[in-house]
Amino acid sequence: MKTQNIPKATIKRLAVYIQVLTGLKRDGVEVISSEKLARACSVNPSQIRKDLAYFGEFGVRGVGYYVHELISSIKQSLGVDRVWGCALVGVGNLGRALLRHKEFALRGFSIRAAFDCDPYKIGEVVSGLEVVCTRQFKARVEELGLEIGIITTPPERAQRAANYLVDGGIKGIVNFAQARIDVPKNVPVEYVDFTHHFYSVAFNISSME
């Protein structure tokens, strides 16, 4: 499904809906109204209906949403109804933390390879994965079915890491490095900066004082 015309904010909210719905399913909830789902997701009911309308019709009037079916439908809409092979470049503190984070695999993102250029890290085993030299990246992409690259290098090495990923045939990148990277337009990039959340919290605290 082509989603170029769907706002990024909608995609991010859909990810929240999946997280909340998965928790509800785990708690034994089978059906939920749009009002209750909206409260759980900290949005209004009309926003949920608008977001879901991009992908079709969901829910039953007077009943609500069937939790299991809605999870499956949203996952299919986002393309996460299958497992994505991921490669991580940069096995520092953040890289190690992500490798040990089991939630990625549970949500359909399997980190299958870890790469670094530091000779002292190459050969080390982290969370069951042997750290491999970045020069071997291209050879591992097809072998391991790698499609998404994760950059956790220092800022000054981010572009070099991106080059390895693109040259190896990676289709998309999640960049945790505090640096912008230059990649072809057909390779989507998501930048992750934890400080943005601190800014938001600081602003909300300040606005209430």
From Swiss-Prot:
Keyword vocabulary terms for this entry: Cytoplasm, DNA-binding, NAD, Repressor, Transcription, Transcription regulation
Location(s), subcellular: Cytoplasm
Chain segments annotated as coiled-coil in the UniProt record: none
GO BP annotation list: negative regulation of DNA-templated transcription; response to redox state
Chain positions recorded as NAD(+) binding sites: 90-95
Classification via InterPro entries: CoA-bd, NAD(P)-bd_dom_sf, Rex_DNA-bd_C_dom, Tscrpt_rep_Rex, WH-like_DNA-bd_sf, WH_DNA-bd_sf
GO molecular function, one term: DNA binding
SUPFAM superfamilies: NAD(P)-binding Rossmann-fold domains (SSF51735), Winged helix' DNA-binding domain (SSF46785)
Gene Ontology CC, one term: cytoplasm
Pfam families documented for this protein: CoA_binding, Put_DNA-bind_N
Lineage: superkingdom: Bacteria
UniProt DNA-binding region: 16-55
HAMAP family for this protein: Rex
Assembly, per entry: Homodimer.
Family designation: Belongs to the transcriptional regulatory Rex family.
Function summary: Modulates transcription in response to changes in cellular NADH/NAD(+) redox state.
NCBIfam families membership: PRK05472.1-3 (NF003989), PRK05472.2-2 (NF003993), PRK05472.2-3 (NF003994), PRK05472.2-4 (NF003995), PRK05472.2-5 (NF003996)
Name of the featured protein: Redox-sensing transcriptional repressor Rex
Species name: Maridesulfovibrio salexigens (strain ATCC 14822 / DSM 2638 / NCIMB 8403 / VKM B-1763) (Desulfovibrio salexigens)
